[in-house]
Each structure stands twice: as C-alpha cells, then as structure tokens.
Amino acid sequence: MNISQTDAEKLAAGCHGNPFSVLGLHEVAGKLSLRVFLPGAETVEALDPKTGRVIVTLNQTETPGLFEGTAARRKKRFAYHLRITQGAHQWQMDDPYRFGPVIGDIDEYLLGEGSHRRLWSVLGAHVITHEGVAGTHFAVWAPNAQRVSVVGEFNVWDGRRMMMRQRGATGVWEIFVPGIGEGEIYKYEIIAPDGSLLPQKADPVGFGAEHPPRTGSVVRKIDGYAWDDAQWMTRRADVQRIDQPVSIYEVHLGSWRRVPEDGNRPLSYVELADQLVAYVKDMGFTHMEVMPVSEFPFDGSWGYQPIGLFAPTIRHGTLDEFRALVAACHRENIGVILDWVPGHFPEDAHGLGRFDGTALYEHADRKEGFHPDWNTLVYNYGRAEVANYLAANALYWLQEHHVDGLRVDAVASMLYRDYSRKDGEWIPNRDGGRENYEAISFLQKVNTESYGEVPGIMTIAEESTAFPGVSAPVDAGGLGFGFKWNMGWMNDTLQYMQQDPIHRKYHHHEMTFGLHYAFSENFILPLSHDEVVHGKGSLLDKMPGQGDDKFANLRAYYGFMWGHPGKKLLFMGCEFAQGVEWNHDSSLDWHLLDHPQHRGMQNLVRDLNALYRENAALHGLDCAAQGFEWIDENNAEASVLAWLRHGPDGGAPMLVVSNFTPVERSHYRLGVPQAGRWVERLNTNADCYGGTGLGNLGGVQSADIAAAGRPFSIDVVLPPLTTLFFQLDDG
C-alpha cells in the first residue's frame, strides 16, 4: 500500500483534514498512482472518459473502501471516470479528487483578509464548468474545523466520501463535485477541533433552502436572470432622492392574502407579482417594504430570526421567482425595500451557532454573544470575516436582486452593549462605556459600501433611541443611513390618539414635541407591524369612541401623518382599518372592504398618497426645517393644530389643519402668508371616505385680516375629528 497507515485510518474514520493529499492521482516512485475511497464498493476501475477503456484496475487495500492502483503506461496526469461495482449494481462517476482548486489567488487573498465584497461569488454552491466538466463548486468558511465534507443524496449523506480541501490560512474549505447541479439538496458535515461530529449545517451562503421544517440547503443558480427593469434602475437615483416622495407599504408576504380553497396557503412570489404589485400601484405607494425574506426556520419569527441570509424563503418560491416579484414592482415604478436582520440569529443546530465547533460567527462570552430579548445569538462585529459576511450579504441583495433599499432591524440593540441587560450582564467597551464600537464600525461599513457600490439605493435604520447622527454621513461621524424611523413620533402621537378627546388638551404636547427634533435626522414616520401585534390591537382598536368616531379619529390621524414632515410607512391592512390585530397565520380581512367605512378609509389612504406624491410642498422638504412653519401650535384647549408645508421650488404652500375633538368649529380663523383663494385639496371628513361631508365647499377666499402674525387669514369650518389640506390657488 502506497499510503501511510495513519492516512488510511483517518480516511476510514472520516477525519482526514487534507484528503486531496492522498486521494486522486499522485506520483509515487516515478509512476502515477490513483487512490479512491468508496465505502461499500467491491471493485473499482478507472476508465478513459472518451473511449471507455480501462486505464487501471484499482485494488482493495487493507482499509475497507480504500482502493489504489498504478497507471504503469501513463506519464502525465489524465482525466478518468470511475466504474464501481457493488453487488448486482454497477455505475460510473467522476472523481472529485481529480480536479484542482477553483478559488483563485486574488479571491484567496481577499478571503484571508476578510474583505471580499462579493463573498457570495466565491462561497456557497455554484453551478460551474471546471476543467471542462459540469458540476457544482462548494466552498464554506470553517477555520477551526478538523474536517469539512459536503453531503447529500449524491454521496448517500456519507461525510467520508467528499471531504473538502482547505485553502491555506483563509479558513475556507472547497470541493468541486462533478455531475450535480440545480436543485441538489446538501449540507456540510463538520468535525470540531475536539474531534466531535457536529450536527449537519446548512450553507451560510446557500442560495436556496428546503421547505421548513426540513433544513437542507439547495443548489440554485444565481447567474443569468433576464432582468427587464433597466428603465427603473436608470432613474432610481433620482426617484429615491431625499426631496422625492417616499410612501412605503409594509407587507408580510405570508399573510397579505391567502388562498382558502387551497389549504389557506400563502401566495407565491409569482402570484404576489401579479396581485400585490397591482394593489400597491393602485394605492399609490411609492415603495413596498417586505418583512424579512431571508430563509428562516420558525414561522412565528416573521423572518426576524434568519438562518439562510442569502436564500429568499422557499415558502413562496425560488430565488428567480423572487427576482420576478422585484422586477414586477420596478415595471410599475415601485421601489422594493427589504427588512434586513444583521443584529442576531437563532441557535438552531443547523445554523451559524458554533458553526465549526467554536464561537465563529458569535461572541464566545454570552454577555456579548447572547440576546436576552429573543434568545438568539449576537454576531461578533469585531471579527473581520463576520463583518465582511454581513456587509457582503447587504450587497448581495442590492446587486443580485436589484433591491432598492434595506431597512436594518433592531439597530438600537446593536449600538449598546447593555441593551436589555442588567448590571453584571454586559461587558463595557474599551473606554468603560456602553456603546458597541464594533457594531458602530460595522454599520458604517455597511452604509459606506452599499452606497458606494450601488448608487441610488437607500438604507433605513429602525433605531429607537436618541443615538446621534444615525442618518448623518460617515465622514461626518454619523452611521451613514439614508433614513431613520421616527419611533418617538410614533409613540407620542399614538399615545395622544388613544386619549378620549375630552382629555387631549392635556396631552397636546405629544403632537407637537416631535417638531422639536423632526429635522435632526432624515425621518420616516412608521406605523409598522410592531404597533398591531402582541395584544396591542389594531390601529382602529386604539382609537377612542364607538363606531363612526373610531373611523373619524383614524382618518384625522392619517391626515395629520401625511401632512407632517417625514416620509411615510404604513403596515398592510391599516390602509383599510383592519379591525383586529395582525395574525401572521391568517390573511388580512379583505371582506371588510364590503363595508363603506373600511372602503372609505382605503379611499382616503389612496388619495393621501396621491396628494403627497403630486405636491412638492408635502415632500420636497420633508427633512428640512425650512419646509415647515407653524400657524396654530398652541391651541390645546380646542385640540387644533395648523401648519404650513413649503416646497423647495417656492411654489404654493400647503396648509394642514387638524381638529382632534368631536366638536365642529365654525368660523375658525387661520393666518395665511398670501392672499387669494385657498382650495380645499383634501378633507378626511368627505363622504367618499366615510365622513359626513361637512367641509368648506371646495375652498375659501382670504381676507385682509391679520392673524397668527400673518397679514391675511381665512375663515374655515373645521369638521369634528378631521384633518384638512388647503393650498393657495396660484392660477
């Protein structure tokens, strides 16, 4: 036997860390020797792949499954197929150990440095042609493993058969498996540093996954999709500027609409591309924000505990079918924002936790590496390879899937080491403080690389604290996000709206306080899924009163929101006043649209979107103080608020007035900066919205009567629980 007993024993035990050094073709004493390890085989022959003739018959060694033979007549390395006999069965296969490495020197250098921005082009499973043979290249990062194998039906899930090659000091293992391709299910089998066999792992850079609860990765081609959205991609940078309208429809794909006649299943990506896109277009939203689609094991996490960061969830279809949904949005000039979750990951055995038997992606110390709120693991942002893995994942969605923006989940939990931790449960930073410097650097890296590599996109932070500079540029010391959710505005205004109108005068500041900081960040006003779950009820539930009063309150609130500075976000179902809180296992209650009040609410949101989109006064200076001017800020007794919105072009301003009491206020005088007819552009009390129709008969003429420090004023009717929009008729 031309192999050491130690090597043979390691092969048989499946713990050889360098199988390519002993398997395949090797020169021994000036001759080419061929070795294969095929447990269960009885005879093995090497054939000429062109002629089918036997090149060499391999002999069984003392080690079961290990065969070797010498090609006495061959002087140069040669291609071959293996013919294997086992009982009555005979088959041919190519030998993975006859192929050279796939990863090149530049990729190897970038991997070793932890700076490969297109990490997904190297790691994962790629269908390729290598050395003239079609197959799939597998590569995975597991630097501390003793051995890594790819396993699947193609090798009867036997980790001894396809042990991988380690690439220098990169910690990456690779192997080219000839003859397998799209749709193949696989996992990685890893032996930890202590010699223990770990649970089989899904591919951290897998592009497809099995239907949960199955946990395998699936080979998917990521190249060659025929995009047809060039027109959108060309103009996207202009559409997504800060001075453009951004009105976002937040959607959970699994519960937007279901198919009751087919087991109440959720819609597929293909069906969503037809039905959802048409609906978002009809409603006038500029963007659709999709709750996380990266593959996740537990439905009840809503996608916020992902494991397959590079795989669109198979619950709705394949990777290319997800791309078709994005393309359908773009054809209708709708931007697509993905919820992205780099803050934590679940402890499921097939996931990233202790991936190679060590704390690889997470911190080893649970004070840093475990999240008490969600019982999940926290990424080690200070490790270059981990930060690169996540930053590359952001680029992957933006580049490979043409996604237009990323909304980063739970940013506050990343920024602070003591987030949801008691004294003694967290480790201070190097300066003794609570800020997580590594997470801050990571977020800056993500934003710098995302905006730098993919111009025209947007990034959005869900950040619930007063951390400074979230949407400030990185070179100015900020985190570099394009926008930040205004959680303070949401909490304050919802608190106000839940008050009985008779008590609102004591809470007036909750509606005005947000303007003290409204321009400190580039804000989005969010009424998200978080406000309609966990016993909070629906938005309609939160409104005081009974019947029509509830709807009137909510209509007035929506008017206030669309008239307020900041981009807009509304969770699905809220646009037609879903009556109960959201349930991820059920469809929205679309039957409610048979009722006039719900249909009226839908009409209102559609018209608010149109008014917002079409008037620069309502969006052009959303994030700039010069776009806002109070007219009536302090009338707490009447619970009335009035303000002007200005556009960047000096056009006609928009006057917004909200009356948050159930009292009609006739002859209410409002100061205005210019004389003329002020047209009533929208009245949330209109008949078509489910209101009484009381209003100002299309508009009012100003009078030369000074009011509120303005030389002119208008005398208006403020219907109960109503928001009005007036605009100067400039001819």
UniProtKB/Swiss-Prot annotation:
The gene is glgB. Keywords: Carbohydrate metabolism, Glycogen biosynthesis, Glycogen metabolism, Glycosyltransferase, Transferase. It comes from the Bacteria. The keyword Hydrolase does not apply. It is an enzyme of class 2 (transferase). SUPFAM superfamilies: (Trans)glycosidases (SSF51445), E set domains (SSF81296), Glycosyl hydrolase domain (SSF51011). It catalyses: Transfers a segment of a (1->4)-alpha-D-glucan chain to a primary hydroxy group in a similar glucan chain. Monomer. This is 1,4-alpha-glucan branching enzyme GlgB. Pathway: Glycan biosynthesis; glycogen biosynthesis. Gene3D superfamilies: Glycosidases, Golgi alpha-mannosidase II, Immunoglobulins. Catalyzes the formation of the alpha-1,6-glucosidic linkages in glycogen by scission of a 1,4-alpha-linked oligosaccharide from growing alpha-1,4-glucan chains and the subsequent attachment of the oligosaccharide to the alpha-1,6 position.
